[in-house]
């Protein structure tokens, strides 16, 4: 079995890239072993030094998951925190950014939130709409999430702006 372009980095801004790559490896190795006792999986990559890829080649997925959890804890990522992504869409980029700034100003009144952004979304324009993002990080689950929800529901924003809220986002695109 040959895996083309097996670069396991976080392309696509997906928090679960490592987990998905382990699942893919398990699926491929299971299929390869169906037909004969000896099988070979070949990875083509631009990053042969990639830690995830090398641990998979050594058939050591548990080590990958341990390292992933340590990294997530050190960087305050789920499951060690909660995240809420807010995507602000508008017909022009300046309106999108300005809407995001106003929302950030309002959210900053809630103590205990770390608000990152606004930044351009990695997928800046979809269906002729410019997108900006805010990412909110916090520790307590229900109280802060409820406060953010209440604040967003009470916002009086321009009808030219659309908000999309993603609680515990899987990716950041």
Please provide the spans of the model-predicted regions:
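Short, conserved loop/turn and helix-capping segments at secondary-structure boundaries
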Residues: 15-22
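Accessory helical-bundle/CTD segments and flexible terminal tails appended to RecA-like ATPase motors
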Residues: 1-15, 27-173
């Amino acid at each position: 079995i040959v895996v083309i372009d097996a670069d396991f980095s976080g392309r696509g801004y997906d928090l679960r890239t490592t987990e998905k790559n382990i699942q893919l490896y398990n699926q491929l190795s299971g299929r390869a072993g169906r037909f004969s006792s000896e099988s070979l999986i070949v990875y083509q990559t631009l990053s042969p030094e990639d830690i995830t890829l090398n641990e998979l080649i050594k058939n050591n997925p548990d080590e990958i998951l341990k390292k992933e959890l340590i990294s997530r804890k050190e960087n305050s990522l789920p499951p060690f925190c909660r995240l809420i992504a807010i995507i602000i869409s508008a017909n022009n980029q300046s309106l999108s950014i300005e809407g995001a700034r106003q929302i950030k100003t309002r959210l900053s009144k809630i103590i205990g939130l770390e608000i990152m952004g606004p930044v351009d979304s990695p997928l800046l324009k979809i269906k002729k709409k410019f997108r900006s993002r805010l990412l909110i990080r916090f520790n307590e689950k229900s109280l802060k999430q409820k406060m953010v929800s209440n604040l967003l529901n009470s916002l009086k924003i321009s009808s030219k702006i659309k908000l999309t809220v993603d609680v515990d986002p899987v990716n950041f695109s």
